[in-house]
Amino acid sequence: MPEHRFDLSGKTAIVTGASRGLGSYFARALAGAGADLVITSRRLQALAETRRAVEALGRRALPLELEVCDHASIERIVEAAQEHYGHIDILINNAGVNIRKSAVEVTWDDWNTVLDTNLRGAFFVAQAVAKRMIPRGYGRVVNIGSVTSVFGYAGITPYCASRGGVKQLTMSLADEWGAHGITVNCLAPGWFETDQNRVLYQNEAWVAYLEDRIPLGRHGQPHDLDGAVVFLASDSSAYITGQTILVDGGITTGATKATVQDDA
C-alpha cells in the first residue's frame, strides 16, 4: 500500500482530553503523520506541553478550553476550530473520567459525573463536529473506548457502563453518518498506565497477575497506539466503520499463558 495512504498532511484533527496521558500521545501521533491539531482540556494551561510537542514536529496546535459536560462549551470550541483552520477532518473523542468505588458505594453524582463525561459528552462533541463534516462529505471520528466495553471489572461499574455505551454509540453513528462519507470507529486500549489507574500500577503483585493474562506478556505503552489511531484517522481505513479496534496485547482472547502451558 502506498505510504501516502497514512499521510495526514492538510488534515485538521480535534483531540479532546489532550493535556496528558493517552490524549497527549494521540495528538503527537497525528502531528507526526502531518495533521494540524486542535487540542482541548478543561484547563487551558495544562495543554502547554502537548502544544510544544506538536509544534516541535512542525505542525500547528490550537489549544482550547473545553468542558465536555457543557453543550455551549462544545459548540464554542468546534466553531473556533472551524474558523481557525477552515475545516475539521478528524475527531479523536478522548476526554474521560473514572471513579473507583464498589457498586454499593457509587452515588447518584458519581454516576452522573462518569456517564455525562464519557458518554453524553462524547456524543455531543461528535454531533457538533459531524455538523461541520456532513456538508463536506468527509470525516473520521475515532471514539476512544476501553477493554471494559468487552469485560466487566469490579470497582468501576459506571466506567464500564460508559465504555459499553461508547461502543454502541460508535455503531449507531457509523450507520447514520456513513452516507455522508464519515467513518466512526472506536479505539479500545487494554491496560496502559495512565493518571486514572496509576495507583494500581504501584501494586507489583497486581501488575504481575495481569501480565500473566496478557498473551504478549506486557502492559501497553503509549506508542503501541500510534499505528491504530493514525490508521483510523487516515484514508487507509476508508472502508472500515462501526468497528471497535482492541489494542490490548490479546487480553480479550480469554486465554492465559498459564492455561496454555498447563494444557500443553
Residue spans of the language-model regions?
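Short C-terminal tail/terminal secondary-structure segment
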Residues: 2-5, 151, 230, 241-264
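Conserved glycine-rich cofactor-binding loop
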Residues: 19-21
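The beta1-alpha1 cofactor-binding region of Rossmann-like NAD(H)/NADP(H)-dependent oxidoreductases
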Residues: 44, 66-77, 108, 224
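Substrate-binding pocket helix/loop in short-chain dehydrogenase/reductase
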Residues: 102-103, 110-115, 210
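Active-site helix of classical SDR
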Residues: 126, 162
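Alpha-helical segment proximal to the catalytic Tyr-Lys
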Residues: 131, 175-179, 238
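Residue(s) in the substrate-gating loop at a strand-loop-helix junction
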Residues: 146
